[in-house]
Every structure is written in C-alpha cells, then in structure tokens.
Amino acid sequence: MPILEKAPQKMPVKASSWEELDLPKLPVPPLQQTLATYLQCMQHLVPEEQFRKSQAIVKRFGAPGGLGETLQEKLLERQEKTANWVSEYWLNDMYLNNRLALPVNSSPAVIFARQHFQDTNDQLRFAACLISGVLSYKTLLDSHSLPTDWAKGQLSGQPLCMKQYYRLFSSYRLPGHTQDTLVAQKSSIMPEPEHVIVACCNQFFVLDVVINFRRLSEGDLFTQLRKIVKMASNEDERLPPIGLLTSDGRSEWAKARTVLLKDSTNRDSLDMIERCICLVCLDGPGTGELSDTHRALQLLHGGGCSLNGANRWYDKSLQFVVGRDGTCGVVCEHSPFDGIVLVQCTEHLLKHMMTSNKKLVRADSVSELPAPRRLRLKCSPETQGHLASSAEKLQRIVKNLDFIVYKFDNYGKTFIKKQKYSPDGFIQVALQLAYYRLYQRLVPTYESASIRRFQEGRVDNIRSATPEALAFVQAMTDHKAAMPASEKLQLLQTAMQAHKQYTVMAITGMAIDNHLLALRELARDLCKEPPEMFMDETYLMSNRFVLSTSQVPTTMEMFCCYGPVVPNGNGACYNPQPEAITFCISSFHSCKETSSVEFAEAVGASLVDMRDLCSSRQPADSKPPAPKEKARGPSQAKQS
C-alpha cells in the first residue's frame, strides 16, 4: 500500500472535497493484456496439466468475437456511465456478500501504544480527550478543510481521491440475509443532537456531544463519562449483552435483528446506534497479559463474551476502545474505507491528544448537563436463543485465532533503502521466501494497492508471488546447487524489479483482479450459465489468497492487524520503521499446516539471509551496523 504524505509545500493545499478533485476515471485494461498476465501469475502455482487446461480455456474466452470481447465491450460501456466501473462489484465481492462474522474475518484493528492509567478517572480522561479529537476531526471533514492526500512511493506526487474520509463517521453496515448494505448518512442539514454511543459493561449509552448548539468540552465529556460508568455499574439495571449479536455471522445477525425490530423500543435504540458518530468502548481489564500480542487480541475479538467481546457493536465503522488496563485502539468495519485512511485519521487524533494531554482535564461544573441515556433493548426468548448461539460462536473465533505480533529489530527500512531497494518490495520477497521455506511452494498472494489516483478508487491487488520471486526463493533454499552469492543477488534484484513493475501496474489501474472481477459479474447478467473461465479451478484458486498481506506504515507508535482470509491462510500485516519492522502474523489453529510462530520465525530468518546477501557485495562502510547471525524468533523472547 503506497505511503501517503500531505501536499508538498511547493503545491497549493486544496480543500479535500472529493467532488472538487479533477481525477481521471479508472481505466479499463486491454483484455488480452489481462489474460496474458493472469496466466503468467498462475503458471508456476498450479500443476502443469492443470495449467494447460486453463490455458486452453483462456484462449477460448479471449478469442476474436468470443465471450471475452463481448464482456469487454459491456465493461467499456459501464466505464462511460459510471464514476468507477469496479467500485460496486468490488464492494459487494470483498465485503457485503461475505457471510462470515466481522471480528477477525473482516474487521482490522489499530493498536495504540499501551497507556498507563492509575485509575478509572485516567481512563475516562483519555476517552474524553479522544472524543474531543474525533469532534475536531469531524469539523475538518464537515467544512471540507482536510488537506488533500498525495501519493508517496511509486509514482509519487499525484493527488488522491478523498471520498473515503467522508465515510469515517457517517457509515453503517446493515446486516442482510444474503447481502449486507452499506448505509451512509447523507443529510446536509444538522440532524438531531449529534451523539456518540458509549459501550460500558456490555451496556450502551447515548452521549450527546452537542447540547443547546454547543459542543461539549473535554471537561464536559469527562463529566458525562463518569456518569455513564456509574450507571453501568448498577447491576439492577443491567440488560442482556445485545452487542454479541453483531459478532455473529451476517445472515444470523440479520435474522436476530429482524426479531429485535418487532419492538418499538428496540427500533428506537437501534436507530440511535446506527446513526451515531462512532462508538467508544470502555473496556474492563483483559487477561492481565499486556504484551502487544494480547492487546491486539483484545481489539480483534475482545477476548470473547467473558471479557470484552460483547462490549462492541461491530456494524459501526469506528469503535474506539479505551481499556481500564491501558489497552487502547480502534476496531474498523472495513467496507467504507481502506486502512491507510483509518491510519491517517487515527494519527491526527493521537497528535490532538498529545497536545491536549499537557493539561489535566477536570470535570466542568459551570452548568448541570442532562444525564446520558441508557439504551433500552428488550430481549425476547427468541433473542435469548440468538445471544447464546452468538456467544458460543464468538468463543470459537477466539479459540481458533493463532496470532502473534513479531518485532524484527535486526534492521529496518533505513538499511533497505541504502541498498536502493523499495522496503515494501523487499519485505514482500522476504514473505515469499519465508512461505517457501515452510511449505516448499508459493501460493496466490494478496497485497493491497491503492487506486485512489482515480475517481472513487479503493484498491486492487499486487500479486507478489511472481515467477521471479519463485526463482529467487528456490535459489536461496537449494543448498545442493551452491549458487554463488552474486547470482542469488541478481535473482533478488530481478524479483524486486518484478514486484515494482506489478505495483506500478496496480496503482495505475492495469492489474488483473478488478478487471476479471468485473468481467465475471457482467457475465452473470449476460450468460445463462457461468462461463468456464470463471469456473475453472485455476481461476478459483487464484482468488483463494493463502497469503494476505498489507503494508500499513505509521509515523506514531501504533500498528495494524487482521485475520487470515481463508481457512488454511496466513495474514501478514507489516509496519516498516527506520530500524525495525513490526509484523502481525495470523492463522487458524484449526489448520494443522499453519503456525503463526513458525511463520514469524521464518520471516525473521529470511530477512537476515537477505541482509547478509546484500552485505556480501557492499564496501565495509555501508554494511548494516552490528550484524547479527540470526533473527531471534518469537520463541526466543522476540514476541511483542
């Protein structure tokens, strides 16, 4: 994912109203180019006989006057009529059609630096400061005063579509029986008093942040949060943990929501949740373990229903978690916006809080504020049954996730840049080497690439398991051949160049995944039967991303994490820093073939070997400082 920077000083900073940016439309790649690239991406990942069969299928699909050309013409017509020809297809395919539960399977989390709260008041001061930052940031959005993002990295200096920012606080993912709906509040007039929903002890409270046309100060917010904590502690008033329902599979939650909506009180309460700015989850202590790994798990799934897993409402785009034990961060419903937008927003909030925290926030007592309101949710016997089922399934998610935060500190992006390499490409090749070492094969790999250079652009896929990467990893693991280091280095450079070329293809709208997706979806309307092209095992395999990766760089102390996207897969989110690289590695215990600790150790070993390979041709003064023979893996106290 390309790194973002604010507009360079030499360029005028424009308001970020996405309607005002004169961005080009996403281009439609040439059909034959996409088909050739598809075959090139898959040839080395499937058996030879299977590839020959797929090659013939692709040839028939792309033949002159054939189905491929017909679909391509339809797609070009769609490009003319829409702002972005793939956005609807992509949103449905990536998110809204997915029936899996949101925690771990879909919703990523950003984990802040651990906080050291002395008491509950410290926790609430932090939460009040965070809410104040949210309101300040929302003011920038409402006034279209947010500076435009500009691309950095490959093809830097281009303005990026800002539309996603306007969904941060105005979106809600409504569960459906077969497909979810992404709802956006579009009203330009001021709605009812703006409010945040505060979750505390699995109860939900309405915190009005504007009262009598005045935005509440941090002191006011602190006062109101103290009232909420007191109200939540009243066990006589406690309601069932309805938030658990949002952690269930999407179809199951849609069914449970239909039951809830039969009651008018529930309808009003759900409406307040669905229209809120964001959630703030005041969590109780977790397991007592406060490593990066355990804090990340608290954000990803809350530790299940016995800890903080019910203190959530997963449909809301942003849930800010402020834990009594100092575990803080944000859980993101991913469908409205991409990770880099979340990081930009979060870094803005943390900078606001660093400035604000220089003064001690005390409760304001100038005027008596109306008490926050507890949301009433009536629970029928049928809903009780849904809750029991949801709790059991969330517990299965918690037990099944195999997750580790691994900080590789032998070197970071400073050393990689000294080699004249892209840190992202270097790390991607290291991930391929790690996977090959463990499994003696490469697999379809997903790396998100921003296409925000275009109107309403989201992402496409960099397929980093290239033939060139395979040649390199085979050379690095074939100890019998004894290939000279100089030849291995040349293979590394070739693999890096292949990754760079595919990255440029992706960010300029020329990659294959979105294109093939659109052709497949157009075929649904045009063909009575699914075309053999999209039923072929090679195509189906190409969309099972056993390795799901993303670079999410930050300038502040925080990191992003998510779960695998297939049952036998690994998630690998990484954050390159000058002298270290933080990896969040995920897999499922239910797959006996995978192990997150083993994969993290293999990544560390691969990065060390690649450093040593680079150092073999360097003059002494440019070698990395204090070479280390081995990367200590998670089992050697490297787990964060």
Swiss-Prot record:
One of its GO terms (biological process) is antral ovarian follicle growth. The modification Phosphoserine is found at S17, S365. It catalyses: choline + acetyl-CoA = acetylcholine + CoA. GO terms for molecular function: choline binding; choline O-acetyltransferase activity. Keywords: Acyltransferase, Neurotransmitter biosynthesis, Phosphoprotein, Transferase. Residues 614-640 are annotated as: Disordered. The active site is at H334 (proton acceptor). GO terms for cellular component: axon; cytoplasm; neuron projection; neuronal cell body; synapse. Its EC number is 2.3.1.6. It holds the Pfam family Carn_acyltransf. CoA binds at residues 412-424, 450, 551. Belongs to the carnitine/choline acetyltransferase family. This is Choline O-acetyltransferase.
